[in-house]
Amino acid sequence: MLRRASIMHVRIAFIILLAICLSLIGRFETSAQNRSRANLQRRNTEIARMVTEIEARNIERTIRKLVSFGTRNTLSAQDNPMRGIGAARDWLFSEFQKIAAQSDGRMTVEKQSYLQEAQPPPRGRVPKPTIITNVVATLKGTQPESVNRLYVVSGHYDSMCTSPIDAECDAPGANDDASGTAAVLEMARVMSHYKFDATIIFMTVAGEEQSLLGSTYFAEQAKKNNLDIEGMFTNDIIGSSTSDTGMRDEHTVRVFSEGVPSSETEEEARTRRSVGGENDSASRQLARFIKEVGERYVPGMTVRMVYRRDRYLRGGDHMPFVERGYAAVRFTEPNEDYHHQHQNVRIENGVQYGDLPQFDDFNYIARVARVNAAALAALALAPASPKNVGLLTKKLTNDTELQWDANHEPDLAGYEIVWRETTSAYWTNSLRVGNVTRYVMKGMSKDNYFFGVCAVDRDGNRSPVSYPKPIR
């Protein structure tokens, strides 16, 4: 009897020990899969090399050349080869053509022009019909399944002094927005030597100071032609690291993104109010992606996400895109100097006014351009964000079941589910789930977390996150 009891005790101890071992193995496997987003990311060597090739001296050269045209007011001369917006337009077109000539035929350049009807003051800023021209360089993607997926980066090359309809005054616009224009041109120069799955559009627009005219026309045409623009960046006032109060910050760039989509329908609004998601628009996901990628590839730079569509009561060239349902964000320096913005060039009470190149920080602009380039490259190399992502709600349960449509990229490795606390600004956790289109997060209630899904290719390139809609 004693011997039988001893054998039974040994068996019980063995079973307990085996259960503990299996539990530890399970925990190890889970922890290996369920790691923080930061730990899961690895650097792409091509992107790392690309950002080092962006040079401040090229950006400075472009800014000084644009300033040399005296004014780039949209209403200024279009047929003068030395002064006015026409001279700036033609020079930019020529520079993009030089870049395209070195791209093995993958980049094309065009002038996108239209006749803007008069919108006279006080309501408008176009006293007479005016030709508006965007200079657009398109770097075609090399993967057939992704070539029609587009990413747009822009700066506006027009400028203004105190009055937006004064076409004669000097309006150097070194920061607003030769800085953004120069960043776009430098990105095109560097990135044209690389191949991407998706297509990237480098665009310099006119008419921004006349109420976003050039960008509105481009966005309207894109919507009309059903272009698949998955993300749009505008760079506007990225030139100075010092504010008018002397505050200096050389290592921060603000990225503005809207939460509730401008294009939201009433039905979509009702759903959002029922399930949350006011901080999970496509534009907000794009901003999170930029922060994650930009800070990974540009050491020392902080991408400060601002939960606004733009600065207080102000606007930029990303707005026509978000209003038409595209994900779009704005890059801007951390602290603006209003002595050098929309001012006639003058000295008053010992203070220099005017948007002059001497107030630009060319090294800072280069750092912002590197953040842009890293994010653009990561987007164009990654698979598309999963489509029709849904959270199944047919029955009450403390599990969370997600489903999505399959991607079609040939190099797709699978998908990743991400989640965060409802009070967290960023995705904090992720789980590789393989090449499936449905997955159940056991023991994780949809009431307590926000979930999302991204696609991952065989090289580890990840798409921006898609936020799910409820499926009843």
Regions found by a protein language model. Give the residues of each.
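Short S/T/G- and acidic-enriched coil/turn segments that sit immediately N-terminal to beta-strands
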Residues: 184, 434-440, 449
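Extracellular fibronectin type III
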Residues: 458-472
